[in-house]
């Protein structure tokens, strides 16, 4: 069985590494320098970094220069997310040399553009599906974005290479991942799925790893690592 890829997260707000609860602005806990956090995960054995510009996602400015600095300082693979919704923001993201880019809100609001980007960039593009129930939520999670499975069907037809699935109700809560949601998304696509939100323990990671045969490829881990629920080394060992 192939192992679950782990993607420690560095979310950047106003120049700081932060974690949110339910992805809501105003719930930040700051963890200092994004570059230091990213380098610490790399030193601990991470093969991936999930790097998010929260200001860009929420439309409260951006941390573009800092995000580029962090991405370019990494020797490991970087998945870049947050506010990538037009040609300009996509070009800036790709220019960092990141391995792949997560489209979020843009996928909901400008479907024609997303189809074009998927056709042009293929495997460098993943689409973030931020879900509450079976409804997608766009732009920093404050808007309704339509039905999950209708959108998934459309993106499958357009050739989307990968999905990053977040259960907003679980994100930043340390309440455990939504395994049913992950199973349902995997059943609706033959593309790999990256799980995000709710991981609180090594058992949660083992449970997600149990879905690798169903199509789950990776798990983004944020608050549990920052809250020291377990170390990245322990997580890598538990899922190898």
UniProtKB/Swiss-Prot annotation:
Swiss-Prot/TrEMBL catalytic activity: 1-(5-phospho-beta-D-ribosyl)-5-[(5-phospho-beta-D-ribosylamino)methylideneamino]imidazole-4-carboxamide = 5-[(5-phospho-1-deoxy-D-ribulos-1-ylimino)methylamino]-1-(5-phospho-beta-D-ribosyl)imidazole-4-carboxamide; N-(5-phospho-beta-D-ribosyl)anthranilate = 1-(2-carboxyphenylamino)-1-deoxy-D-ribulose 5-phosphate
Places the protein is found: Cytoplasm
BP GO terms, sorted: L-histidine biosynthetic process; L-tryptophan biosynthetic process
Sorted UniProt keywords: Amino-acid biosynthesis, Aromatic amino acid biosynthesis, Cytoplasm, Histidine biosynthesis, Isomerase, Tryptophan biosynthesis
The keyword Transcription regulation appears for this protein: no
The organism's place on the tree of life at top rank: Bacteria
Record-linked InterPro entries: Aldolase_TIM, His_biosynth, HisA/PriA_Actinobacteria, Isoase_HisA-like, Isoase_HisA-like_bact, RibuloseP-bd_barrel
Predominant cellular place of this UniProt entry's protein: cytoplasm
Any single Pfam family the record assigns to this protein: His_biosynth
Gene Ontology terms for molecular function: 1-(5-phosphoribosyl)-5-[(5-phosphoribosylamino)methylideneamino]imidazole-4-carboxamide isomerase activity; phosphoribosylanthranilate isomerase activity
EC number(s) from the headed UniProt entry: 5.3.1.16, 5.3.1.24
Enzyme class, first EC level, given as a word: isomerase
Active-site residues per Swiss-Prot or TrEMBL entry: 11, 130
One Gene Ontology cellular component annotation held by this UniProt entry: cytoplasm
Subunit field text: Monomer.
Annotated family: Belongs to the HisA/HisF family.
Protein function: Catalyzes the isomerization of the aminoaldose moiety of ProFAR to the aminoketose of PRFAR in the biosynthesis pathway for histidine and the isomerization of the aminoaldose PRA to the aminoketose CdRP in the biosynthsis pathway for tryptophan.
Protein name from the UniProt record: Phosphoribosyl isomerase A
